[in-house]
A protein has these predicted regions:
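Flexible loop/hinge segments at secondary-structure junctions
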Residues: 4-305
Length: 305
């Protein structure tokens, strides 16, 4: 039985309908997590509109707000919500806040090498593994696999930690969600992208790392998580879209839209495409999860305000 709320028949997600006179260039600056998805969207959009060009710079979510403030980007992909300070900085310059659209769902996964027999982790264990400060109630540092009950010879050594760098939205959100805004251990090997984290974990039987689930490969396994070992929650479409999985999150596109005025035609049509059946099919293609229909309809309404 589905755990997702239904949407009224008059509010079904529409197909995208091609419009005349769409041309120009979209500049995207922001999230590495959304880099592949932005590429998929741009490629499909260009098949509809051959005279549209894209420039995509994916250096991390923290680069999106300054680029939108300065006008060097038309769209800012982000894997986390805007901080209050980022909204204030934008509003100070433009006189109104940016429009933030939810465009996909993802989860920050805890990956281990695919043969690792660990059944799952409690949230306190996650804190003990990754955090120096353990603000989430970790019961002491967990530095060796034996502390998690693994007795196999392959897991007699220390746990090797992998994660993202500080400019990443994934880093910032995991810090809040998993570490209760505590500090990471200095033994976390920081990587420039989620793909690098997954590759590192897949290449090392004693490794564990956090990364965007959309970058999962056959070489890794995403661990179930829970408050206790008796209620581990697997990472799948239902638990992410229903927000039961502890580290579920939305992915966003942020734009500069003046209240009461329409976006320029090119930006408006690209966002309408993203928030259509065809755009959400690309979300699935990239390994992420489409947003619920009720959420998507609300995002389309934001474009009309």
């Amino acid at each position: 039985m589905s755990i997702l709320p239904a949407v009224g028949q008059d509010e079904q997600v529409p197909h995208y309908v091609r419009q005349p006179g769409v041309a120009g260039k979209i500049t995207s600056v922001g999230s590495d997590t959304l880099a592949n998805l932005m590429t998929f969207w741009s490629q499909e959009f260009k098949t509809l509109y051959p005279h549209v060009g894209f420039q995509i710079q994916a250096s991390g979510s923290s680069t999106a707000p300054p680029a939108l403030i300065e006008g060097t980007a038309t769209i800012g992909p982000m894997s986390r919500a805007l901080k209050p300070s980022e909204i204030r900085d934008f509003t100070r310059v433009h006189g109104y806040p940016p429009v933030v659209l939810k465009v996909a769902m993802d989860a920050i996964a805890i990956f281990v090498e695919r043969r690792n027999p660990l059944p799952g982790l409690t949230l306190k264990q996650v804190d003990g593994i990754f955090s120096q400060t353990q603000y989430c109630g970790g019961n002491g540092y967990i530095n060796h696999w034996s502390q998690l009950g693994l007795s196999e010879e392959s897991y007699q050594g220390p746990i090797r930690l992998y994660g993202r760098n500080s400019v990443s939205g994934t880093y910032g959100l995991f810090k809040i969600m998993a570490l209760c805004d505590g500090d990471f251990k200095n033994t976390v090997n920081e990587q420039p992208g989620s793909a690098s984290v997954v590759l590192s974990v897949a290449s090392s039987i004693g490794a564990i790392g956090y990364a965007a689930y959309g970058y999962k490969t056959a070489g890794v396994r995403a661990l179930p998580l829970g408050e206790t070992a008796d209620n581990f929650i697997p990472l799948n479409s239902d638990t992410v879209r229903g927000e039961q999985y502890p580290f579920s999150r939305f992915l966003y596109l942020v734009v500069n839209k003046k209240p009461g005025e329409p976006l320029p035609t090119l930006e408006r049509e690209f966002l309408r495409y993203v928030l259509s059946k065809e755009g959400q099919q690309q979300v699935v293609r990239d390994g992420y999860f489409p947003i619920r229909e009720d959420v998507l309809i609300r995002q389309r309404r934001l474009l009309a305000q």
